[in-house]
Design a protein with these regions (language model features):
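Short acidic alpha-helix that forms the nucleotide-activated donor recognition element
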Residues: 17-28, 50, 64, 68
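Short glycine/acidic-rich beta->alpha loop that forms part of the nucleotide-sugar donor binding site
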Residues: 37-42, 49, 59
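Short hydrophobic beta-strand element within catalytic cores of glycosyltransferases
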Residues: 54-57, 67
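Conserved acidic donor-binding segment of nucleotide-sugar-dependent glycosyltransferases
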Residues: 69-70, 74-81, 90-96, 110
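C-terminal alpha-helical cap of glycosyltransferases
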Residues: 114-134
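Nucleotide-activated donor-binding/catalytic signature segment of Leloir-type glycosyltransferases, i.e.
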Residues: 1-17
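Acidic donor-binding loop of glycosyltransferase active sites
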Residues: 26-40, 53
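Conserved donor-nucleotide binding/catalytic region of nucleotide-linked donor-dependent transferases
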Residues: 1, 90-110, 127-131
């Protein structure tokens, strides 16, 4: 808070303290995940989708496994703050886009339920063992 005050941006920030993301995310206009290093399958992206919030993230390979740009989220060039700001501005100023991203994200997260993931692993194991997907 003190650093924000020193920078003169304290009136622009909300610092709610520790809250569960599921409780906080529905109050957000968008979820921004600007990672510059890979982190596997991002739980944050899925949390955004579960709560119906449009997702904006860096175009890391791991994020692109989840996010289809302009379909279920927006992708920004990794480490490029201008690209990230442009994606944020697009999302915040285009209500139709924001609604579509949230709806598609909510559908996309269904691909990652425990049951669905287990089915996909079992299909993979069967194919690797040469038994098809009976």
């Amino acid at each position: 808070k003190e650093e924000a005050r020193n920078l003169g941006v304290d009136a622009l920030l909300a610092l709610p303290g520790r809250r569960d993301s599921v409780d906080m995310l529905p109050d957000c206009d968008a979820l921004v995940v600007p990672s510059v290093d890979g982190e596997g399958s991002s739980g944050a992206i899925k949390e955004g989708w579960v709560t119906g919030v449009p997702v904006i993230c860096s175009a890391l390979a791991s994020n692109q496994e989840l996010v289809r740009g302009d379909e279920n989220g927006l992708l920004a060039a990794v480490g490029d703050p201008v690209s990230l700001a442009d994606a944020m501005a697009r999302c915040l100023t285009d209500e139709g886009l924001r609604v579509r991203l949230a709806e598609e994200g909510s559908r996309s997260v269904l691909e990652f339920t425990d049951t669905r993931m287990a089915e996909q692993y079992m299909d993979l194991y069967r194919r690797l063992m040469g038994k098809g997907t009976e």
